[in-house]
Regions:
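PLP-dependent enzyme catalytic core of the Aspartate aminotransferase-like
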Residues: 2-6, 10, 21-23, 29, ...
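Conserved N-terminal alpha-helix of the aminotransferase class I/II PLP-enzyme fold
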Residues: 55-103, 125-130, 136
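Conserved C-terminal alpha-helix-loop-beta "cap" of PLP-dependent enzymes
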Residues: 116-118, 310-311, 315-383
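Catalytic PLP-binding core of fold-type I/II PLP enzymes
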Residues: 193-225
Length: 383
């Protein structure tokens, strides 16, 4: 799982950036004697972007709506309202939108809806569907065919070459058929596809009749990043399916699966249920996305995470730390020696990524919609 920007090749990969093993985890002040009158300082957590509950506006809306009876399975008025908000946001009035319980379920459902039973999905080696979905895609009958990652991204020329090799193989009738392409925005390393890159990938996909799927588990952090030159409408124009992540961007849980050109398969509700992605109390998802997409709340809270990450990134650079991967979003990857890991993780939760050949650890610092200025200042002081 190496990046083209990484100076060292990992000797043993422990995990990828989407889910991590946390290290340490007790604040040093929590070990104070029981007789001490000073309260223990709260543990700093920069482990991931799903450690907090939900934005207060969502909790208020859920509380206000708590005793309103509604029909189930996403057939309610609030899911319809959230769907219309998404359609306006992406400038696709006929888009088919479903609210699903989580990211793995969403990816499994989307791929199974798009690919034939013998179809495979093409992804880079570091892709979430290849590394951290416990074989969910394969369990639904779809092989994951991998290409090299380049700072977490897919090269369109390598995708075209893979298709050429498959088409030229006289035995391809006996092989899993490349049937769709999966990428993430932002990537597992927090990097971004720029508009030219995504357009190039989309061109190859359409020339080969391969639906393009964009995993947007961290879409808010991508679109809000200073280096992002695309909009949600651009993604809807270039992709055949994508998700709008809620779990990692302010919601309690849930992802919106969006098909800009309409439903990809008949009886989608049955397919969604088959993959364990259908929530009986579907309005709980609708309420959350209705709030997130009202008055730009989704992007506003994502900007906070990116701003906090930018401040940490500058501090790391100023202090001479080696940052790996050219992320401009809420994920920062830094190579640390064992002593520094021990010192920092005695005071703050970080994510362990992998062990590098030179013995250092690749650690992730991850901000979220809920990260405060004070938390960022306290982390920087520890560096």
């Amino acid at each position: 799982m190496t990046s083209s920007t990484s100076p060292a090749t990992p000797a043993a990969t422990a995990t990828t950036a989407s889910e991590t093993h946390s290290t340490s985890f007790t604040s040093s002040t929590s070990a104070a004697p029981a007789t001490s009158s000073a309260p223990a300082a709260p543990v700093l957590s920069f482990e991931n972007d799903y450690s907090e509950g939900a934005h207060p506006a969502i909790l208020k809306a859920l509380s206000d709506d708590n005793l309103t009876p509604r029909p189930g399975y996403g057939t309610d008025d609030v899911c319809r309202s959230a769907t219309e908000r998404i359609r306006r946001w992406i400038k696709q009035p006929e888009a088919y939108v479903r609210f699903l319980v989580g990211g793995t379920q969403a990816n499994q459902t989307i791929i199974d809806a798009i690919a034939p039973p013998f179809g495979a999905v093409v992804a880079v080696t570091s892709a979430h569907v290849n590394t951290h979905e416990a074989g969910a895609i394969e369990a639904s009958g779809h092989k994951v065919i991998t290409l090299p990652e380049h700072d977490g991204k897919m090269d369109p020329d390598e995708l075209a070459a893979l298709c050429d090799v498959f088409d030229a193989d006289d035995n391809n009738e006996h092989m899993a058929v490349p049937s769709c392409v999966y990428v993430s925005q932002s990537t597992e390393y927090g990097t971004l596809y720029d508009l030219d890159e995504l357009e190039g990938l989309s061109r190859v996909c359409r020339s080969r009749h391969l639906p393009l799927i964009v995993d947007g588990a961290r879409l808010g952090y991508a679109l809000a990043a200073a280096g992002c030159d695309m909009t949600a409408a651009d993604i809807a124009r270039l992709a055949d399916a994508f998700t709008i992540g809620g779990t990692k961007v302010g919601a309690l849980f849930g992802e919106a699966a969006v098909f800009p050109h309409g439903a990809p398969a008949p009886r989608m509700t049955a397919l969604i249920k088959r993959h364990g992605a259908l929530l009986a109390k579907g309005w709980l998802l609708g309420v959350q996305f209705d709030v997130l997409l009202d008055d730009d709340l989704y992007l506003d809270i994502a900007r906070n995470a990116d701003r906090q990450a930018d401040a940490i990134r500058r501090a790391l650079t100023d202090r001479g730390y080696e940052i790996m991967h050219s992320s401009s979003t809420n994920q920062i990857f830094v190579a640390l020696d064992a002593r520094t890991v021990s010192r920092l993780t005695s005071r703050v939760r970080l994510g362990f990524m992998e062990r590098l050949d030179d013995g250092r650890s690749l650690m992730r610092i991850c901000t979220s919609w809920a990260t405060t200025d004070d938390q960022t200042r306290r982390l920087i002081a520890l560096l």
